[in-house]
Amino acid sequence: MNILDRIIETKRQEVARLKIDGVAQAEARQLNQSIHQSLGGTDLSVIAEIKRASPSKGDISLNVDPVAQAKRYAESGATVISVLTDQTYFKGSMEDLAAVTKAVDVPVLCKDFMIDRIQIDLAKAHGASLILLIVAALDDETLEDLYAYAYASGLEVLVEVHDALELKRAERLQAKILGINNRNLKKFEVSLDTSLELLKTKSPGVRYISESGIKTVAEAQMLHAAGADGILIGETLMRAENPADFIEAVNGVKHDTY
């Protein structure tokens, strides 16, 4: 059983418990403009992530204050803040998500492994404006159902792919925001070539986000020149002495610079 399979098995157990406990219904958080619109333009957008740990890197910043970190991200110009909420493998929590959404005005992504509608309800109840759907973790029927349910619930969706076959599945879904994960979730190996290759076949009107393994402004520049509208950065910002410097430098990257 690979890492992704183990995570999904854990999620099935979590979903079973959620269905017993229930989730309170809530109104979707209101934004001034859609996240899809926010990710447009010539500037390279930053989705800045709060990430305590990961299966591949172990503990990264267990004692981080998520509110203070989120405020640093927002003040530095992050377009979206991502909060990892998986507890077993990434040591995050829904409490982190709720605290961040109350502290900042920018949209917040609930970064988790969604396999059931009740997880979307939970993310919404804790203030998320955006959820993640990982194509590799879902069959087509479930993917389509969760995608439609999220939008019907007033949330937007980042649909994550890793290869050409997954990209085709996401395109059939007519996903508006596509994340290209440079990390293979089955082996947790990373290569920026994944984004460079998949960005060759962009569809008009879709926002493309390169995720994972981005460590330098030069890499951000390369990805933007290849067609990325934004980048999702977690570990690099969590380990940085001053994440604001990195975010501000990336915010200065424009298409017309190249």
From Swiss-Prot:
CDD domains, per the entry: IGPS (cd00331)
E.C. number: 4.1.1.48
**Chain ranges passing through the membrane:** none
Q: Name one GO molecular function term.
A: phosphoribosylanthranilate isomerase activity
For this UniProt record, the keywords arranged alphabetically read as follows: Amino-acid biosynthesis, Aromatic amino acid biosynthesis, Decarboxylase, Lyase, Tryptophan biosynthesis
UniProt similarity note = Belongs to the TrpC family.
Protein name stated in the entry: Indole-3-glycerol phosphate synthase
Species of provenance: Exiguobacterium sibiricum (strain DSM 17290 / CCUG 55495 / CIP 109462 / JCM 13490 / 255-15)
- The gene from which this protein is expressed is trpC
